[in-house]
Design a protein with these regions (language model features):
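Short active-site oxyanion
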Residues: 1, 23-24, 53-58
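Glycine-rich adenosine-cofactor-binding loop
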Residues: 1-16
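Short amphipathic alpha-helical segments
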Residues: 13-15, 69-73, 185
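NAD(P)-binding Rossmann-fold cofactor-contacting core
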Residues: 19-35
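Phosphate-bearing ligand-interacting subdomains
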Residues: 31-88
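Left-handed beta-helix
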Residues: 63-73, 77-132, 140-147, 159-161, ...
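Glycine-rich hexapeptide-repeat left-handed beta-helix
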Residues: 133, 139-204
Length: 204
């Protein structure tokens, strides 16, 4: 089951159309958009009761902050990763519960994707790289090999991270940026320069 009926929910539903999985429906605190093509079975508060038959869940929130809020509200749910059939994930890569891997994405050998993180369409996570929980990579992000992206980091479309660097928790990297060195505190990277941000979890 998918919690959330925004754009992220529609994207995840597309990944669940294959013959090996069944999309039971959606839970949403709000009315779904007009023309929503999938069944809405209740609100997020109904999830614990619906989980008793072994259903898996994934949170489809359109921001990192909202995604984490749902998981914290319902930590007991059986969260499952969703990998789009058109993605390629190496046999020894690790994808933790609640993560989503989009169409055309590549996760290299020995890489790991943290719980409730999102790897957007066409993004590449290189060999032995680690994406920690609650990160979001938009489409066509290129992560080199042996890179560590710490929790609550947001990376915009088509950004590139050089091999063997570490990005601090809560960092925001804007669309199209190229990052070639470590970032040791929470920052925004924009137009080739780091801009200081206060410590604490990142938001988008």
């Amino acid at each position: 089951m998918v919690i959330g009926t925004g754009l992220a929910g529609r994207v995840i539903a597309d990944a669940l159309r294959g013959p090996e999985v069944t999309l039971a429906g959606f839970l949403s605190a709000d009315l779904p958009p007009d023309g929503w093509p999938y069944p809405v079975l209740g609100a997020p508060e109904d999830a614990p009761g619906l989980s008793r038959d072994g259903r898996g869940f994934i949170v489809a929130a359109d921001s990192l902050k909202d995604r984490e809020a749902v998981v914290r509200a319902f930590p007991e749910l059986g969260y499952q990763a969703v990998i789009h059939p058109a993605a390629h994930v190496a046999a020894d890569a690790v994808v933790e519960p609640g993560a989503y891997i989009g169409a055309g994405a590549v996760v290299g050998t020995g890489a790991s994707i943290g719980a409730h993180s999102v790897i957007g369409e066409g993004s590449i996570v290189g060999a032995l790289s680690r994406i920690e929980p609650y990160c979001e990579l938009l489409a066509r992000v290129n992560i080199g090999h042996e890179v560590t992206v710490k929790d609550h980091t947001f990376i915009g479309h088509s950004a590139t991270l050089k091999d063997k660097i570490t990005i601090a928790a809560g960092t925001v990297i804007q669309t199209g940026e190229i990052v070639v060195k470590d970032m040791v505190m929470k920052m925004v990277y924009k137009r080739g320069a780091w801009i200081y941000k206060e410590n604490g979890p990142g938001e988008r």
